[in-house]
Amino acid sequence: MYKVSEFSEMTGLSKETLRYYAEVKLIEPAYIDPKNNYRYYDDGSYFLALLLVKLRSFGFTIQEMISVMEDESFAHLEDLLIQKKETIRLQMVELQQKTEEIDAFLASGKELKNK
């Protein structure tokens, strides 16, 4: 069992994030000491936390992560990952278009300046 401070250090999740994730039922302590309300996490919690960190790095929202936790099937996770990948791909296309528009705008400004 790991204390919150140890678990936070191991996973890279802040104590506040762990508290919030427990609030929204994403990851709950394996044990809460009734004497002092200290929260403890176990190895299962550790692997779950690593998954949550990875999903967050992929841009998953809290709601999407809750959806993954509610439906633990790999097929569901795979579907969500494919959807997220497509969303990111579309964002990349949009960003590329914006950079091209900025380049064109800058070029037109330089042309006006040189006249």
Tell me what each language-model feature is.
Residues 53, 71-114:
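Short, charged amphipathic alpha-helical surface segments
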